[in-house]
Amino acid sequence: MQLNIIGAGLAGCEAALWLADRGVQVDLYEQKPTKFSPAHKSEGFAELICSNSLKAERPDSASGLLKIEMKMMGSHLLDAAETARVAAGGALAVDRDVFSTAVTEMVEKHPNITVHREEVTALDESAPVLVASGPLTEGALAQAVAALTGDHRLSFYDAVAPIVTAESLDYDKVFAASRYGRGEADYLNCPFNKEEYENFHAALIAAERAPLHDFDGDLTVYEGCMPIEVMAARGADTIRFGPLRPVGLRDPRTGHRPWAAVQLRAENTARTLYNLVGFQTNLKWGEQKRVFSMIPGLEHAEFVRYGVMHRNTFLESPKVLTKQQFLADHPNVFFAGQITGFEGYMESAASGLLAAHQILARLQGCELPPPPAATMCGALLDYITTPNKDFQPMGANMGILPRTEEINTIRDKRERYMALSQNAQDAMCAWTEEYK
């Protein structure tokens, strides 16, 4: 059995090591040092760019649960992370250089992995191939991917609004309605009075913005969508006549039209997550929490994702990718990592593990169902392959896990999350036992 893997990032290395352990002859292609992306600096594999934190380890946290599931699936990168661990309280943080060196050595010393330090410019569909080229995929490879998926199915920039959990909203203030009462009440609305709006506007235009990385470039040229803080700076009423326009809405508390209103749109079919419509932003994350918590009804909102605007090459996965992580119209071409819409270091590595399981099944002539949606891995996979007219990448969070009626009755948040985590662990344990 033989497989080509393109990209020696977290997803590619995780997949390569897992498959090689099971007798697959892996040819791993990495363009460094022949060619560097604008973000990468070292020749090592699994290079961490923006942070050395691999997030929380608590089992009642989304990140902690994800790591538990990855261990059940046979993660090698978590072993490497342990050797590179640095003190970080309840989080798993690593020395980036030590981590990258550990992963590189694991890969280069494995007898079933052959490393090719060269750029890949075309995709050979004659046999299974795994594309794990990352969020900065560009040039000939990006063109090759676009040729298979269609140019309109490959995005090159993220402009994402914040996402909050439904259970953290204040429904004494937030109300469901569509403008003018047309159709179903598909939106949740957060109504401002004049004073609330003016205070929010002042805080928004004064908030500190995140610096763009060199590789992000001028995003507005490509996005055609303006950050909410930039729009607000144009005038006191600009956003009130834009994304915060209150026309067609009536606040049930007052019986009148609000001065302004933020609309929340469901992010998933279970309606456990909502995004802030029109709130693409480049504010620092701490500022987003501070300023957006001034929105009526969001005072205690739990943000599962903050808004970002950055360079990010990713597939419109719900339109092109199966739950087995291959292209629906090109079944020998598998994808893993951030290019699929898995957002985050550990999420990327997890998607590599998931793809590896599917590829081994293919090479053995078997079919493998994905992990149950009750698991964090299964929920993420379900998210990126479920139709969504405004698809954006997603990281691990408790909001994407399905809830049972019993879990919904648990009032304490930490206990509720622990119950979700235990359900997920049980489901992943059963899946790995059945399909190991």
Task: Locate each region found by the language model.
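Hydrophobic anchor at the start of a short beta-strand
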Residues: 3, 24-26, 129, 154
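N-terminal FAD cofactor-binding segment of flavoenzymes
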Residues: 17-79, 373-384
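Predominantly flavin-linked oxidoreductase catalytic cores and closely associated redox partners
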Residues: 109-290
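Internal hydrophobic alpha-helix adjacent to the cofactor/substrate pocket in enzyme cavities
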Residues: 348-370
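Beta1/beta-strand and adjacent pyrophosphate-binding region of the FAD-binding site
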Residues: 1-11
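C-terminal auxiliary extensions adjacent to catalytic cores
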Residues: 391-436
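A conserved beta-strand/loop capping segment in the N-terminal third of enzymes
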Residues: 57-104, 108
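A glycine-rich dinucleotide-binding beta-alpha-beta segment and adjacent secondary-structure elements
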Residues: 276-342, 349-351, 369-386, 391-397, ...
